[in-house]
């Protein structure tokens, strides 16, 4: 986890342990991390696992970010590096928030 912030870092909220009700995530815990704008999904999953420890033989992480565009709420599943780049750089949300769900395999 990055402790000291650098010029290329983005503040990111990781929220986990809550529940989805339609397009809203309720409850849980939020951790703030600083990540590089070029962070990959794999690197993000490593950071998530440092915070949300679970048995990866039985569970997988689902990463989602929520955006309000012209009154329409969009849940973006973050599966690729391109998805993550959109959340961190292009979406103009400051700070971005990623919701972490743990799904049984």
Stretches with model-predicted labels:
Residues 1-105:
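Phospho-regulated scaffold assembly regions enriched in serine/threonine/proline and acidic residues
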